[in-house]
Amino acid sequence: MIKGNIEMSQTQRSAAEIELAERARKVLPAGTFGNTALDIVIARGKGGHVWDVSGNEYVDFLLGSGPMLVGHAHPKVEAAVLEQIPLGTTFFVNNAHGIRLAEEIVAAVPCAEQVRFVSSGSEADLYAMRVARAYMKRDKILKFEGGYHGMSDYGLMSLAPKRLANFPTPVPDSAGIPKSVREEVVVAPFNDLAAVESLLNQHGKEIAAI
């Protein structure tokens, strides 16, 4: 979300927003929901724009990190949600809407024979790696340096390395990642097909997925 300089001065922020930011620091790690601007507190969104509590407008390039693909408060989405709310929202079992969506995805994506719904991209990547390992009966994953694949231990290998390392050695991007994970990830430089070919020649029989 950017419109102009993201570093807003105190005069651009209302007392209400300053208070909310201070409250956030007490109950949220680093005072924010994630890798977002610390002092911006969003009040509403419409289409591709959002407004903070102080009334400042931003172009929203994040769009909920993907889910708000059609923009905020889209009339058709609003209508569908309002229609469903009185009927319940989360059931953890099959429902007609989920089955219909799965059918539409399968029809739209030729290689998707079936669909598994999950709660986040991190979870989807974890399942994909697990299925690949089970099918291939191999343990290693090849990933590209700088590629974001969620917040799992495997996804956070060499995302934004803070120290130099020779390829294919992975560098963990967070504390708390077991050393054993490093042995299961092979890191390739981005946009270097020759390097990937070399790594596959060396480790191909151990790699379950790229």
Give residue ranges: language-model regions.
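Short, Lys/Arg-enriched N-terminal segments with co-localized hydrophobic residues
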Residues: 1-7
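Active-site-adjacent loop/helix segments that line or gate small-molecule/cofactor pockets in enzymes
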Residues: 9-46
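Short, hydrophobic/aliphatic alpha-helical segments
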Residues: 15-23, 49-57, 107
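Active-site and channel-lining beta-strand-loop segments
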Residues: 40-62
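Short, well-ordered beta-strand elements within core beta-sheets of diverse protein domains
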Residues: 44-49, 67-70, 184-187
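Glycine-rich loop-to-alpha-helix module at the N-terminal edge of alpha/beta enzyme cores
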Residues: 57-142
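PLP-dependent aspartate aminotransferase-fold enzymes
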Residues: 103-208
